[in-house]
């Protein structure tokens, strides 16, 4: 007997709403045993990011190896990776274990909710050419998709063009999150090999508590993939979970800025294989 297990590789958020903390909360709430490898320590709260200390690449590599050699996670999620050396270390390490995990979900964290840049400019090319081709699924929002595709996105046709360009970089599935368009309805678009296969509609929930929503969604998708669901089902269920978490925490005041979602609005016990 064994739990379903996942590994998150990301930065630490001292206020607990995003990053590694949000990933572990999400995976735990969805009944998946979470392990972690920390890439950076951030100094932040709900109002902003005030400092970033990268973890030495050898330590990042060691954390991943320790988990892979012992826990054998079913799926992996990658969030904040800030510099070239860390990205190379992660890529080289994961390539050694490619036959051990089925899915790699990458959330290309580039800018925080408060507007702080979280990926060094010179790291983008290394991220695109080294790490991105290993991904099963990439989950960019509109600004991140614009950076990765090198185009401005103003409508759905632009989203399709961006997804086509991103898919050519080597990632099979691309989920472009349309939340940054505004309006009463939020639509995310899923592409497979550059072709639109489905979209996910959700209501716009009025709240300041949006800190860590991208981390939460990608971790939820990873959790459902860990539990052997197909990509479409995993994303649909993750979207439902995120909406529930936002709704459950929309009126709660944590801090003076963008507060967190309520990850534990409907927690599950750990699932067994």
PLM region spans:
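N-terminal basic/disordered segments at the start of proteins
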Residues: 16-32
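Short pre-catalytic strand/loop immediately N-terminal to key active-site residues, enriched for Gly-Thr
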Residues: 9-15, 197-211
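Conserved phosphate/ATP/ADP-binding segment of small-molecule kinases
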Residues: 121-197
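Conserved N-terminal subdomain of the carbohydrate kinase-like
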Residues: 2-8, 28-106, 110-113, 264-267
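Short, small-residue alpha-helix embedded
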Residues: 146-147, 207-231
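Charged C-terminal helix
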Residues: 54, 233-273
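Phosphate-handling active-site elements
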Residues: 31-35, 196-198, 224-238
């Amino acid at each position: 007997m064994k739990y379903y297990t996942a590994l998150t590789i990301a930065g630490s958020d001292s206020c607990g709403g995003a990053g590694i903390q949000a990933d572990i909360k999400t995976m735990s709430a969805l009944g998946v045993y979470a392990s972690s490898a920390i890439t950076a320590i951030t100094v932040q709260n709900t109002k902003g990011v005030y400092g970033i200390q990268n973890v030495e690449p050898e330590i990042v590599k060691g954390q991943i190896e320790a988990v892979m050699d012992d826990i054998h996670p079913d799926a992996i999620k990658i969030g904040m990776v800030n510099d070239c050396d860390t990205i190379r270390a992660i890529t080289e390490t994961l390539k050694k274990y490619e036959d051990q995990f089925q899915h790699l979900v990458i959330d290309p964290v580039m800018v925080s909710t408060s507007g702080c840049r979280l990926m060094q400019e010179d790291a983008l090319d290394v991220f695109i050419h080294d790490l991105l081709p290993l991904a099963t699924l990439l989950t960019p929002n509109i600004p991140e998709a614009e950076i990765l595709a090198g185009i401005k996105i103003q409508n759905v046709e632009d989203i399709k063009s961006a997804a086509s360009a991103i898919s050519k970089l080597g990632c099979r599935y691309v989920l472009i999150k349309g939340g940054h368009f505004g309006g009463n309805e939020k639509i995310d678009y899923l592409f497979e090999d550059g072709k639109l296969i489905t979209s996910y509609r959700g209501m716009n929930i009025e709240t300041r508590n949006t800190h860590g929503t991208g981390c939460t969604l990608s971790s939820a998708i990873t959790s459902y993939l860990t539990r052997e669901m197909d990509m479409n089902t995993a994303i649909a269920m993750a979207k439902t979970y995120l909406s529930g978490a936002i709704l459950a925490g929309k009126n709660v005041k944590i801090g003076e800025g963008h507060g967190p979602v309520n990850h534990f609005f409907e927690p599950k016990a750990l699932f067994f294989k």
